[in-house]
């Protein structure tokens, strides 16, 4: 299925983050770097998940955890091996894929806007990069799979 690898990678990123949090609890290190990274990441990921549809920039994500932009970048790299903006882009595309299937009456353009993309062509381009098909093809294939199953 197109995009399967992307979805698996996204799920693995979340799993790695949660394992990281479990590990830092086990070592009981008080005010360690792991504790602060975990807390910061949770704040920044929550912010992204609640505001992904808005026009976000690095400074807004960093402010969510009360840190500077450089520390935000370092924290993301340490914990999920991705930049905040790469994570945001993947999150937007993943949400768009879910919306395509959940809201068949919504146009690709409407969904692009709801996911924070400034144009449907930009959304389609990014979607293709992650899912190796257009949003319309993705919707059609998944509808066919649903009808066949």
Outline where the language-model segments fall.
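Juxtamembrane/interface motifs at transmembrane-helix termini
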Residues: 27-29, 109, 145-146
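Flexible coil/turn residues that form the inter-helical turn or adjacent wing/linker of helix-turn-helix
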Residues: 1, 54, 104-106, 116
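Short, charged helix-to-loop "capping" segments that act as catalytic/coupling loops
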Residues: 98-111, 119
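Short, Lys/Arg-enriched, Trp-marked, Pro/Gly-tolerant hinge/linker segments that flank
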Residues: 1-54, 59-65, 78-86, 90
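Basic/polar phosphate-binding segments, predominantly the helix-turn-helix DNA-binding elements
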Residues: 47-51, 55-94, 112-137, 141
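Generic C-terminal helix-cap and adjacent flexible tail
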Residues: 140-149
């Amino acid at each position: 299925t197109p995009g399967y690898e992307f979805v698996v990678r996204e799920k693995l990123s979340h799993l790695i983050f949660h394992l990281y949090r479990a590990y830092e609890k086990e070592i009981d290190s008080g005010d360690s770097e792991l504790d602060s990274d975990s807390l910061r990441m949770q704040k920044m990921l929550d912010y992204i998940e609640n505001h992904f549809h808005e026009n976000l920039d690095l400074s807004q994500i960093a402010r969510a955890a009360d840190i500077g932009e450089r520390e935000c970048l370092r924290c993301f790299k340490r914990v999920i091996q991705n930049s905040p903006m790469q994570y945001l882009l993947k999150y937007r595309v993943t949400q768009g894929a879910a919306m395509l299937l959940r809201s068949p009456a919504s146009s690709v353009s409407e969904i692009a806007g709801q996911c924070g993309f400034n144009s449907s062509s930009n959304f389609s381009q990014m979607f293709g990069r992650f899912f190796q098909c257009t949003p319309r093809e993705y919707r059609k294939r998944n509808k066919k799979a649903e009808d066949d199953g």
